[in-house]
Amino acid sequence: SAALLGPAALASTMQTSTNARYGMVVQSKGKVTRIDKAGNILWQYECGYNSHDIRMLPNGNVLVTTQPSVIEEITPDKKVVWSWKGKAVAPHDGPIEIHSFERLDNGNTIISESGNKRIIEVDPKGTIVHSIALTVEKPDWHRDTRRVRRTDTGTFLVAHEGMGLVREYDKTAKVLWEHKLELGAEAATPGANGHGVSIFNVLSLKNGNVLIGGGNNNRVYEVDRSGKTVWSIERDELKTVDGKAIHLCWVTSLNVLRNGNLVFATAFAGPDQPILVEVNRKKEVLWAKYPDTTIGDDVCAFWLTDIKGSVIR
């Protein structure tokens, strides 16, 4: 296992970003930052906003939300070559927030719009070529959705933050499957360090199961299609290789590596807790990255850049 670099070691290594292990693009402190596996800052773009999704495209550009309702594709020389601004569509007349997007191989972009309660596919010219109306019983322009991810069968898994549940939709907007988050034994509490059912992320795994980044449910867990939990990482279950307790707060991005390891983000846990953690299926912590002056404890979106093989994210 790799040695972990805890907070006490940060003072002497502040010039870049500490204990990177992987190259990555991260949104934190209102900046998009690309670092190499040594932690050297390769590129930084200041936008004053923290995105809930991020994508490093094959052409080297970065796709990111730079305002609550704006997605931009940014080149390495910081030119914006494509953008989308969400606008209210009747009957909705309030704000729009974009928490999830994906660039398709055909050049189109999948976008989820909270407020409009829809998933849209937009071509490079900005024309909507397909739209899926989401079923949202408790509309909230900030919380209708978090991450939305396509499956290999062409359906969409949607994390409905405000309702604390996952729904799977087909292209006709039919709900095929649903899973509701539970509080468990812990009562609901407010705040960044609180506990609830505000789901953030959802991924379709190769075995057909669904992996959930619970947001303030403070855990990662895998469910089968009957809704049974078959694997989980609970809030205070993990320890670093040197025995220090890891306390999960807002569990956000998930990257499942080819070898089955999981790299995930946990936000708002404070300066003494990791922001990125890699675990294997035995729940052994292989690596953890702590906040530093470049990347803080507010990470909701990261993208590993130098990983061999396919990554589910």
Model-derived regions, located:
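N-terminal export signals
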Residues: 1-11
